Amino acid sequence: VLTRPIIVLFSFACGLAVATIYFSQPLLDTIGAQFSIPTAQVGIVLTLTQIGYAIGLLLIVPLGDIVQSRRLIVGQTVALAVALLATAVSPNAWTFLTSITALGGLAVVTQVMVTYTAVHAAPARQGWAIGVVTGGIISGILLSRTVSGVLSDLLGWRSVYLIAAAAATATAGILMRVLPRATRSRTGLHYGQLLTSTLRLLRDEPVLRSRSVIAMLIFAAITVLLTPMVLPLTAAPYHLSHTEVGLFGLAGAAGALGAFKAGSWCDNGLASRVTGIGLWLMSAAWLLAATLRWSLIGLAIAVVIIDFGLQSVHVANQSLIYRLDADLHGRLTAAYMTFYSIGSAAGAIASTWAYSTHGWTGVCLLGASISLGTLTYWIGNSSNSGTEAAADIDSRCRDNAGHACTAQNGAHWS
């Protein structure tokens, strides 16, 4: 069983790893100018990063079911440091885009750690543990903008990736020392069978399928908000610096509290309710985001609300899918998070196009449409299936050993 200090360490390590793929968001204008990438196409930086992430999810994360997690986590973290270094010293656009795609693929170490947490946390505290680690991931996503903005203004954009490479190297050393040597998973599948099994899960598991679609849509929505945000903030009438743009990441980090609390609620069988509240919040917050032309305060509040809603739904999603089968956690994570990457990649390229053609109003309309579409999908899916409700009941009936108390609570299932 994982101890609290190791769970907190995982939260930090996940935050660092995932931050590396979002460092570029507040720097898109600078990177575009450096490598002569037009404004309408600069979203390709984030899109390629997410494509790399999706490839890593499909090809690397399932290995957690057959390879020792300690070796996989440490090895990926070292390789991530190398990719960060290559990104920092890129001499031209092609090298930069290739390096940042590889960086995205290696950053999936976060999901290997989430899977490790789900498998080894005490069953009665699984939701809380996932919430802590997920809180670290989302905090890393948001604080990455603050860190990269400050470092870019002080030392140039390349320093962001150089310092991150050093931090990743140090983190790999710490993880090597503290992670126990675990036995290899008992599955007898070969690698090819493992990948096929991952795809088959999407066909056979309705909870995984529906929650993956929700993940794709909510991450598309938040990417639509955050990717082009640097463009109006650095232009008239605000003319904010990269450091000041990065401060919006601090506002969003307040929403990270949602992941911690949502995990506890899900442990108490409230995953469906958490999902509904989170999706309503995300949909309504776009009204505040649309006030950017008059005030920065509305945008800051919108970032907090949308992030809070997203994190709550994301933790609820994971809480439900990780109850399916402990021996499949690596493949469940890969299947679920692949949809997250698809949504993020699509949101990045669509949002910069929307901004270049319709301005900030177009961005807000796009984001609101995605959020309302997600809410509509969830309502329709929930009314047609009792699978998730059964999973919520099961979570309320789990004792500290992780056994479902169906004998004592059989009436709940009828």
What are these regions (language model features)?
Residues 131-177:
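Helix-loop-helix hairpin linking two adjacent transmembrane segments in secondary transporters
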